[in-house]
C-alpha cells in the first residue's frame, strides 16, 4: 500500500508482479532504513530486493507487412509461455504451457483465452488448446474456480465463465469423449457460480454470484469477494473512489 501510493511506477501492476529476492523480514528491515530518504533510495531498495518485471517481448520479432492471418500465426510463438517454475511472488505456477495477451499482461487470463483458442483452432494448435484447458482445470481443482488470471491478487474474483465453451472447442477437434473427461471440473465451476442459490428469497435476492429476479428466475452476476482496491490497479481505484465521493 505504501509503495503503491509513492507513484514510483507509472503502472500499479509493476510492483505487484515483482518477485521478492530476499526474505520478508530482510525486506522489511531494509525498507525501514530508507523509507524517508526519497525516491532514489526507494528505487535502489526495490532493485536490490525485487526482480522487477519488464514488458515481455520476443527477441528478433518484428511486425511485418504480411496478411493478418499470417501475422497472428507468427504471434503464437511470441505469446506462448512454458510451464511455470515455482517462484515466489504473485504468479500462480501452471503445469502446462499457455498463451498470454502480451505487454504488461504476463499471465494467462480466463475469458480472453477462449477467444485465443478460436484463433489457435484455426491454426491447428490443438495441443496448446489442450494445455490451456488443462491449466484451467488445474486451477478449478486447486481453488474451486478459475480466477481472473494466474496471480494471487486475482483469487477474489473470476471472469465470465467460458470454460464450457473452451471444452466445446476441444471437443470439435478430439470428439465428445472430451466432455466426459472434464465433467468433474465443469460441475465444480458450476457449483462455484451457483453457490448460495438455495438461500435466495424474495427478501434476500442477491448472494455471492447469484441473483433472484422478481419472476423467480436465477441469474449470475460479476462479484468480487473483496471490497478493497485491486492490487494491480491500486492507485487508479483509489482515485476513482475519491472522485465518486467528491461527486456525491
Features from the language model and the residues they span:
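Acidic, mature catalytic/reactive cores of soluble proteins
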Residues: 1-248
Amino acid at each position: 500500500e505504501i509503495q503503491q501510493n509513492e507513484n514510483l511506477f507509472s503502472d500499479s501492476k509493476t510492483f505487484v508482479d515483482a518477485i521478492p529476492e530476499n526474505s520478508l523480514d530482510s525486506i522489511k528491515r531494509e525498507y525501514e532504513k530508507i523509507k524517508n530518504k526519497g525516491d532514489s533510495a526507494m528505487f535502489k531498495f526495490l532493485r536490490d530486493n525485487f526482480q522487477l518485471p519488464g514488458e515481455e517481448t520476443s527477441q528478433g520479432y518484428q511486425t511485418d507487412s504480411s496478411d493478418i492471418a499470417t501475422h497472428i500465426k507468427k504471434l503464437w510463438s511470441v505469446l506462448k509461455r512454458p510451464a511455470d517454475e515455482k517462484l515466489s511472488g504473485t504468479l500462480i505456477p501452471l503445469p502446462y504451457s499457455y498463451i498470454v495477451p502480451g505487454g504488461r499482461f504476463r499471465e494467462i487470463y480466463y475469458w480472453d483465452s477462449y477467444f485465443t483458442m478460436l484463433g489457435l483452432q484455426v491454426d491447428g494448435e490443438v495441443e496448446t488448446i489442450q494445455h490451456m484447458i488443462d491449466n484451467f482445470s488445474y486451477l478449478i481443482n486447486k481453488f474451486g474456480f478459475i480466477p481472473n488470471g494466474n496471480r494471487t491478487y486475482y483469487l477474489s474474483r473470476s471472469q465470465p465463465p467460458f470454460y464450457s465453451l473452451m471444452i466445446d472447442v476441444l471437443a470439435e477437434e478430439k470428439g465428445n469423449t472430451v466432455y466426459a473427461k472434464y465433467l468433474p471440473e465443469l460441475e465444480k465451476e458450476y457449483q462455484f457460480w451457483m453457490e448460495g442459490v438455495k438461500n435466495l428469497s424474495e427478501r434476500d435476492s442477491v448472494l455471492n454470484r447469484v441473483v433472484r429476479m422478481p419472476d423467480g428466475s436465477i441469474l449470475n452476476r460479476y462479484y468480487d469477494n473483496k471490497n478493497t482496491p485491486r492490487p494491480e490497479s491500486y492507485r487508479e481505484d483509489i482515485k476513482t473512489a475519491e472522485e465518486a465521493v467528491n461527486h456525491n
